[in-house]
UniProtKB/Swiss-Prot annotation:
The keyword Transmembrane applies. This is Uncharacterized protein Mb1855. It comes from Mycobacterium bovis (strain ATCC BAA-935 / AF2122/97). The keyword NADP does not apply. Keywords: Cell membrane, Membrane, Transmembrane, Transmembrane helix. It comes from the Bacteria. It is a multi-pass membrane protein. Coiled coil: none annotated. GO terms for cellular component: plasma membrane. Belongs to the sbp family. It is found in: Cell membrane. The chain crosses the membrane at residues 12-32, 35-55, 67-87.
Amino acid sequence: MGSDTAWSPARMIGIAALAVGIVLGLVFHPGVPEVIQPYLPIAVVAALDAVFGGLRAYLERIFDPKVFVVSFVFNVLVAALIVYVGDQLGVGTQLSTAIIVVLGIRIFGNTAALRRRLFGA
C-alpha cells in the first residue's frame, strides 16, 4: 500500500490524532488564556482558510503537504501578528474586521470552487 492510497498509515495516524484531540478537548474542557482570547477567532478563521484551500488543492490534484502546513502556520501567525500590531496602534478591532472579511472572501471562493468541482454547480 503506497502513501497516496486512501488508507495509508500516515493518513490513519492523522485521523486518529484528530479524533483523540477532539475527545480530549470534550473531556477536559481546556481554557484559553485571556492574553490569547482576542487572537483566537482570527487564528481559527485563518486556519479554516488554509483547510479549505487545501481541500480545493486536493480535489484539483495539486495538493502538496509541505505547502499546506506552511500555509496553515503562516496564515495563523500573520493574521495574529496583524491583529497584535493593530491592538498596539489602537485599531485592533478594525484590523480584525478587515482580516475576517478578506479571509471570509477567500473561504467562500474556495468553497465555491469545491462546490463546482464536487457537484458541477
